[in-house]
Amino acid sequence: MAKTVLLIEDEPNIIEAVQYILSRDGWQVKTHANGHDANAVIKTSLPDLIILDVMLPGKSGYDILREIRLTPECLEIPVLMLTARGQTKDRQMAEALGESRFMTKPFSNQEMLDAVRELAGA
C-alpha cells in the first residue's frame, strides 16, 4: 500500500510539482489549499507525512503546526515545512514548534524526494 502525503499548499505550480515528483515514486498525494480547516483534514486523513506551506490563506503554517503538535493522534506525523522565506528566524520558529524538516522554495525534484523518503522512513 502506498504511503500517503498530505500537501497543504496554495500555489498551483508547487502543488503540481510535488504531485509529479512524489506520485512517480509511488506516493499517494492528497492536497489541501488553505489554512482554515487544514487541521480537520489532517485529523480525518492521518497521513504518513505532511508537507506544509508557511504562508497560507486563512491560517499560517506555523499555527497549523502548533495545532498538529497539540493533537495526540498527530504527534508522530513528520512535518516538512515549505517556505519562500528561508531566514534563520523562520527556521527557528518552525523548529521550536516541532517541524521535522524545513525546506525553502524553490527546491529541486531530488531535494523534495530525498526529504520525503527520509522523513517517511522509506
Regions found by a protein language model. Name each.
Residues 15, 57, 75, 87:
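The feature encodes the CheY-like receiver
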Residues 16-24:
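Charged docking surfaces used in two-component/phosphorelay signaling
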Residues 19, 63, 86-103, 114:
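Alpha4 helix (beta4-alpha4-beta5 surface) of REC/receiver domains from two-component response regulators
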Residues 26-33, 41:
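Short hydrophobic/Thr-rich beta-strand motif most characteristic of the beta2 strand and flanking loop
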Residues 34, 60-66:
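Acidic catalytic/metal-coordinating carboxylates
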Residues 45-51, 56:
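Active-site beta3 strand of CheY-like receiver
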Residues 107-117:
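C-terminal output helix
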